[in-house]
Amino acid sequence: YAFFGTDGKPCVSKGLHYAKMVKTYDDNGYVKTERYLDLSGQPTWHDGICGTDYIHDAMGNELENKPVGRDGSLAPGKLIIRNKYDRVGNCTEYAVFNLNGPALNSWNIHRCVMVYNSLNQETERRWDDVSGNLTTYNTDKYAIVRYKYDLLGNVVSTAYFGVDKKPVKCNEGWASTLNVYNKMGKIVKQSFFDINGNPTDPKVMVPVGICDYDKWGNMTFIASQDGHGHYIINPQTGWAILRMTYDSHGNCLSRAYFNVSDKPMANSDGYHKETYKFNNDNNCTEHAYFGTDGKPMLYYSIHRETYAYDTNGNQV
């Protein structure tokens, strides 16, 4: 493709800094090269490269991605990406190289290896350094992540492991999690565990989150628990339970907050409940706030906001 000015002449895009991008294709119809060109038809720089060379297999899987400079060699500061695939097209390895061989990317990773089960579901992902040793991913502390699935293909377990292949916490503060799903495939319970398999410390990560949905799939209930069936205050949100209601169009009509005893409480903004009303066009016409006693209250000196719309649905 190419860019043209109002005079009909070729021009350089101010944001992209090139006048034309051209591609070539291999015998199977997959992109072989991409080049950014200036007004003279010569390679020019865009985001640190002048283009990319690709290699694909017969199935169209990308085997190599090489960012290049003006002379077609590897662009300065860039890396060659090489991928491997299994017989059904699952990517089993991603690795980066420079002109001297194996290299590290900006996340300090040379290679990522993926493992799949007979249903083509990814069951493990691990990261290696240039020596083939396990290394931690980015700023996280794990080198391996493993997944388990139910018969419907939902992820029921995620677990992290360090370079010593022992359980380790991710940055969020948990080492493994278990998920329970309803018949609609929505999570109704999520449990988090530490490196010893015990419920996480609530100050670090809420041990259990439970939720429920209406028949349309709208979330109507979400709560935090301690791993032993008791409600707790989520230190991140400041409440234990949130209940929501909806109309038949999926518009949220109310949100209300409750404490560990399932009694009305105020959220961090100071109100217990907020309600909404909608017109036939599903435009919100009213937003109001209420206290723990169920009576109208002021939020930023306002109890109720109303909205009006013209015949085109524009707010007026």
Describe the residue ranges of each PLM region:
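Buried hydrophobic residues that stabilize the cores of well-folded domains
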Residues: 1-316
